[in-house]
Amino acid sequence: MLIAFQGAVFALVLLSFVLIVAVPVALASPGEWERSQRLIYAGAALWTSLIIVIGVLDSVVANQA
């Protein structure tokens, strides 16, 4: 279970870096927001889901220790 927790945290960090770069670029480029709006919303939904999954996994891992 610890490996799943670490994998989820790694995925969250990686996705955060991608969103940190992608969102400002999409907002600053003319016409880019309309093209990438669904992708950015999907990334934000995935980011939120990872936060919830990490919270659940953290409680499971903490109870095993």
UniProtKB/Swiss-Prot annotation:
It comes from the Eukaryota. One of its GO terms (cellular component) is photosystem II reaction center. It is a multi-pass membrane protein. HAMAP family: PSII_PsbZ (MF_00644). PSII is composed of 1 copy each of membrane proteins PsbA, PsbB, PsbC, PsbD, PsbE, PsbF, PsbH, PsbI, PsbJ, PsbK, PsbL, PsbM, PsbT, PsbX, PsbY, PsbZ, Psb30/Ycf12, at least 3 peripheral proteins of the oxygen-evolving complex and a large number of cofactors. It forms dimeric complexes. May control the interaction of photosystem II (PSII) cores with the light-harvesting antenna, regulates electron flow through the 2 photosystem reaction centers. PSII is a light-driven water plastoquinone oxidoreductase, using light energy to abstract electrons from H(2)O, generating a proton gradient subsequently used for ATP formation. Belongs to the PsbZ family. This is Photosystem II reaction center protein Z. The gene is psbZ.
